[in-house]
Amino acid sequence: MAWFSLHLLHLLWAAAGTSTWARSSCSVPQAAQHLVDGLQVLLEDSVSSAAPPNPSVLIAMNLAGALSAEARELLADRLGASDSAGLSVGQLALTIMALNSSCRDPGNKVSVLYGQMEAWPPSSPSAPAWTFYGPSLAVLALCQEHPGRALPVAARLAKILAAGLSPFNTDTGAMVTLALTCMYNKIPEGSEEGYRTLFSQVLKDVVENISMRIKDNGIIGDVYSTGLAMQALSVTPEPPNKEWDCKKTMDTILKEIEQGKFHNPMSIAQILPSLKGKTYLDVPYVSCSPGHQVQPTLPSQPSPVPTSASNITVAYTINNQLKGVELVFNETIDVSVKDGSVLLVVLEEAQRRNPMFKFVTTMTSWGLVVSSINNIAESVHDRTYWQFLSGKTPLNEGVADYTPRDHEHITANFTQY
């Protein structure tokens, strides 16, 4: 796909620093603006000195126009002082972009990231799609810093993707699109034409794959991948074969917000830029001039009448049938918890009643992730992890966010990716 092939559009985009989608036909209606304001307040309230600094949160705050200067400065200070050692390429790339969006110098973090990507082993074309998410973020961050230096790294990533055989992943596809669109628009003058052809072909294939994930209600992939996918589709000057109705997507997302689907800070960070008509390509153009930010007036909500919550029963199964793992088991327990409890409460009650259900969690940018059950731990080397399902459907929320229903059957299945 020829991204920003019209030279005039390319110049306008570079000068304005904004994406070119028709915001007038895909913007948040004034009547629903309070929903977006509420999300942003919730996001910024999640920032504290006790919580791990999340660069995605800072990027979203800056793209949206931070309401709390105190929260923004706290997050920027902590990320600026963070040690690059031990960070994945994706985490380091996000940190660089977060600092740039705050008009902070990322210092030697850029050189560290470039060194990591130079040493990045070319993955097999059949590697899981998510393994390309971090490198795509790295290409995007390096493109915004020094596109000429990023060119060979981006070309290596694009060549691997061009031969890709692994199942498509919407989040990764969206990040690939943003990264290679940045590179396509910033190919240094005098570079070989082959770079443009390579990026164009990969972009065409990836965007077509994203468009095939557009559901009838406008959701792209699932509700939590839609934010990044909106960014990706909004920066393409050449629409995919399946037309994207941006307004339908926006309307459905607003309904999901109204129903309380977005309360995890990371999920808010990924949807907020699109609600504000921004993308990660706008990071270098964020204005850092001082200005008085007015806290939005949120509609007052009537105080809920205290009620005595009834109990629900959840069937909870832990299952490991992987060959080569010493302990094989399939155990089910019925757990009674208060209605409205999150899944984590179910796991804690199961663990209290039966030590076989003992579990360990790890904190990630998306919140708590279960990393071990019954002394069987996930392993990057063996590509194993604990997948949670409702019936046969994988959950798209974490254990601290998902609220099970009465008589729902939740399974934790030890599996490979």
From Swiss-Prot:
<feature type="disulfide bond">
    <location>
        <begin position="143"/>
        <end position="182"/>
    </location>
</feature>
<dbReference type="GO" id="GO:0031419">
    <property type="term" value="F:cobalamin binding"/>
</dbReference>
<keyword id="KW-0813">Transport</keyword>
<dbReference type="GO" id="GO:0005902">
    <property type="term" value="C:microvillus"/>
</dbReference>
<keyword id="KW-0964">Secreted</keyword>
<dbReference type="InterPro" id="IPR002157">
    <property type="entry name" value="Cbl-bd_prot"/>
</dbReference>
<dbReference type="InterPro" id="IPR051588">
    <property type="entry name" value="Cobalamin_Transport"/>
</dbReference>
<feature type="signal peptide">
    <location>
        <begin position="1"/>
        <end position="22"/>
    </location>
</feature>
<keyword id="KW-1015">Disulfide bond</keyword>
<keyword id="KW-0170">Cobalt</keyword>
<feature type="glycosylation site" description="N-linked (GlcNAc...) asparagine">
    <location>
        <position position="311"/>
    </location>
</feature>
<keyword id="KW-0406">Ion transport</keyword>
<comment type="subunit">
    <text>Interacts with CUBN (via CUB domains).</text>
</comment>
<feature type="glycosylation site" description="N-linked (GlcNAc...) asparagine">
    <location>
        <position position="209"/>
    </location>
</feature>
<dbReference type="GO" id="GO:0015889">
    <property type="term" value="P:cobalamin transport"/>
</dbReference>
<feature type="glycosylation site" description="N-linked (GlcNAc...) asparagine">
    <location>
        <position position="100"/>
    </location>
</feature>
<keyword id="KW-0171">Cobalt transport</keyword>
<dbReference type="GO" id="GO:0005768">
    <property type="term" value="C:endosome"/>
</dbReference>
<feature type="glycosylation site" description="N-linked (GlcNAc...) asparagine">
    <location>
        <position position="413"/>
    </location>
</feature>
<feature type="disulfide bond">
    <location>
        <begin position="26"/>
        <end position="246"/>
    </location>
</feature>
<dbReference type="GO" id="GO:0016324">
    <property type="term" value="C:apical plasma membrane"/>
</dbReference>
<feature type="binding site">
    <location>
        <position position="171"/>
    </location>
    <ligand>
        <name>cob(II)alamin</name>
    </ligand>
</feature>
<comment type="similarity">
    <text>Belongs to the eukaryotic cobalamin transport proteins family.</text>
</comment>
<feature type="disulfide bond">
    <location>
        <begin position="103"/>
        <end position="288"/>
    </location>
</feature>
<keyword id="KW-0732">Signal</keyword>
<keyword id="KW-0597">Phosphoprotein</keyword>
<feature type="binding site">
    <location>
        <begin position="365"/>
        <end position="370"/>
    </location>
    <ligand>
        <name>cob(II)alamin</name>
    </ligand>
</feature>
<dbReference type="GO" id="GO:0005615">
    <property type="term" value="C:extracellular space"/>
</dbReference>
<comment type="function">
    <text>Promotes absorption of the essential vitamin cobalamin (Cbl) in the ileum. After interaction with CUBN, the CBLIF-cobalamin complex is internalized via receptor-mediated endocytosis.</text>
</comment>
<feature type="binding site">
    <location>
        <begin position="386"/>
        <end position="395"/>
    </location>
    <ligand>
        <name>cob(II)alamin</name>
    </ligand>
</feature>
<feature type="glycosylation site" description="N-linked (GlcNAc...) asparagine">
    <location>
        <position position="330"/>
    </location>
</feature>
<feature type="binding site">
    <location>
        <position position="222"/>
    </location>
    <ligand>
        <name>cob(II)alamin</name>
    </ligand>
</feature>
<keyword id="KW-0325">Glycoprotein</keyword>
<protein>
    <recommendedName>
        <fullName>Cobalamin binding intrinsic factor</fullName>
    </recommendedName>
</protein>
<feature type="binding site">
    <location>
        <position position="270"/>
    </location>
    <ligand>
        <name>cob(II)alamin</name>
    </ligand>
</feature>
<dbReference type="Pfam" id="PF01122">
    <property type="entry name" value="Cobalamin_bind"/>
</dbReference>
<feature type="modified residue" description="Phosphoserine">
    <location>
        <position position="191"/>
    </location>
</feature>
<dbReference type="GO" id="GO:0006824">
    <property type="term" value="P:cobalt ion transport"/>
</dbReference>
